[in-house]
Design a protein with these regions (language model features):
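Short, structured coil segments at secondary-structure junctions
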Residues: 25, 58, 80-81, 141-142
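Glycine-rich phosphate-binding loop at the start of an alpha helix
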Residues: 26, 45, 49, 72, ...
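A structural preference for short, pocket-lining loop segments at secondary-structure junctions
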Residues: 1-39, 50-67, 87-92
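CoA-thioester-processing core
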Residues: 51, 71-126, 140, 156
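Phosphate-coordinating loops and pocket residues in cytosolic domains that bind phosphorylated ligands
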Residues: 25, 34, 127, 139, ...
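Intrinsically disordered, low-complexity segments enriched in small/flexible residues
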Residues: 1, 6, 121-123, 133, ...
Length: 210
């Protein structure tokens, strides 16, 4: 990633997967289970956080092109990208299932997802461990463009080409439609306190207090 940051010949970078029906399915669950030391867990998380932050800070637009399952770390690196595009195929799923393992997204997803779609809908995704259809993710503003699968690669390249003169995706483009209730809760201290109290209770319930 550091080497990419020094490239002056790149106008944009498209992140894709060569695997059929899988973008990135996240971390190795068995590898996570072997970590029993808190310091080791924190360092492992920080190591990937540094990588994703470096990706996020590249001096040109990055586009995550999702054409299959993008969960856990797959969504987290997508959130660190400037834009996210996804195939309209029915089996495409996007989400953060970590809560089902008794943990929370540790590579920046808990911060970047609320920035993109708002606190309330982000908490709903994180605390339910939901994997959303691409069309739902697009409707929430999580995905910037929904592309027909038959021409996905061509259209993703076109999308990237159109973004070569921009550095950041404007906030107004990133935010999906939110209800008056969500806006009211997010924009005042009492509302945020209510949201986080509810989030804490849901997290305890989802992990059975573990």
């Amino acid at each position: 990633v550091e080497e990419l940051g020094r490239r002056i010949d790149l106008g944009a970078l498209l992140l894709t997967s060569a695997k059929p029906r899988i973008f990135i399915a996240g971390a190795d669950v068995e590898a996570i289970a072997t970590i029993t030391d808190r310091a080791e867990a924190e360092e492992a998380s920080r190591r990937v956080q540094r990588l994703f932050t470096a990706w996020e800070n590249l001096p040109f637009p990055t586009i995550a092109a999702i054409r299959g399952t993008a969960v856990g770390g797959g969504l987290e690196i997508s959130l660190a990208s400037t834009y996210i595009v996804a195939s309209d195929r029915e089996d495409v799923r996007i989400g953060l299932p970590e809560i089902k393992l008794g943990i929370v997204p540790g590579w920046g997803g808990c911060v970047r997802l609320p920035r993109r779609i708002g606190i309330a809908p982000a908490l709903d995704i994180i605390l339910a461990g939901k994997a959303l259809p691409a069309k739902t993710a697009f409707r929430l503003g999580l995905v910037d463009a929904l592309l027909p699968d038959a021409s996905f690669e061509h259209l993703a390249i076109q999308f990237a080409g159109a973004k070569t003169t921009t550095r950041r995706n404007p906030a107004k483009e990133r935010r999906g439609p939110r209800s008056a209730r969500s806006l009211l809760l997010e924009r005042n201290p009492l509302g945020r306190s209510i949201l986080f109290s509810q989030a804490s209770k849901r997290a305890v319930a989802a992990t059975r207090g573990q």
